[in-house]
Amino acid sequence: MNKQEILQKLNLSLPVVASPMFIVSQLDLVRACCYNGIIGTFPALNQRTTEGFEQWLIELNEEFAQHEKETGKKLPPYGVNLIVHRTNPRAMIDLKVCVKHKVPIIITSLGAVKELVEEVHSYGGLVFHDVTNKRHARKAIDAGVDGLILVSAGAGGHAGTLNPIPFVAEIREIFDGLILLGGSLSNGKDVASALQMGADLAYMGTRFISTDEAVASDAYQRMIIESGTKDIVYTAALSGIPANFLGESLIQSGFTQDLWDRKVKIDLGAELDTEAKAWKDIWSAGQGVATIKDRLPVAELVSRMREEFREAILSQQQYLKNYA
């Protein structure tokens, strides 16, 4: 399936994927995204057990099928994030459940596995893989993924350090599939900019934390709204993998500034526990907080982004008059 065929299959009204966020992304957020014309996603590990995860898939599949039956209209697909790392004992078990229920999109992190891609392709599913550099991108391409998620500097949670402009250009030279760009995207103008750079879809997380449907405390959402770029801390001190967090939440949880540069062995075991107190009090976010000023329902947010996107594209025509 080529890139254009994939884009048509996604059936989007705005080229946006709401990225899967630990704890934050649950069914209400996924539904709201898909019902409003964008892709909603969630981590499999947001359900504490594989049995609970499977129930979520059954619920979504039945609801989406019923919607199509009643309206004759197909919703954009949803996606599930699988952490493909040796410290995640559920990875392959959850994959089997995804294959069983034919999850439309699988987003893989921390490991591009050819056998996984083949299993998802066996039922017509798509695989998108997180990458932070060209070396990881090549491995994912060799594994046969349909899309690469370029996690650039400033993205919330696990993030890279590359500027998005050369990053997209560098990967486009070696990959003609779908490119999703993540990192500090918060509005429709940012979505238009991502496409101007050569990406096909915008991959947006932090903006969706401050919505009515997100599973995030009032304090978390308030800190998102009140923070700027200077308040985001990039550290590997928690799990061994560099990630962006709200600095104030680190300090309040005892991770003071003197600990931010410490080196620890990669271990996602505790991080992947939704009940771990630390992950309810330590909050990830990207530099896109700088332009997030409110909390609102997903429907209103997507509607506003759609108009911002349209205005941004139209405004580019003025530059042709001025400089062409």
Residue ranges and their predicted role:
Residues M1-L178:
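Active-site entrance/lid segments in N-terminal catalytic domains of soluble metabolic enzymes
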Residues V24, L185-S186:
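Residue-level detector of alpha-helix initiation sites
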Residues D130, G183-S184:
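Conserved acidic functional residues
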Residues T161-L180, S186-A324:
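Conserved active-site-proximal phosphate/metal-binding subdomains
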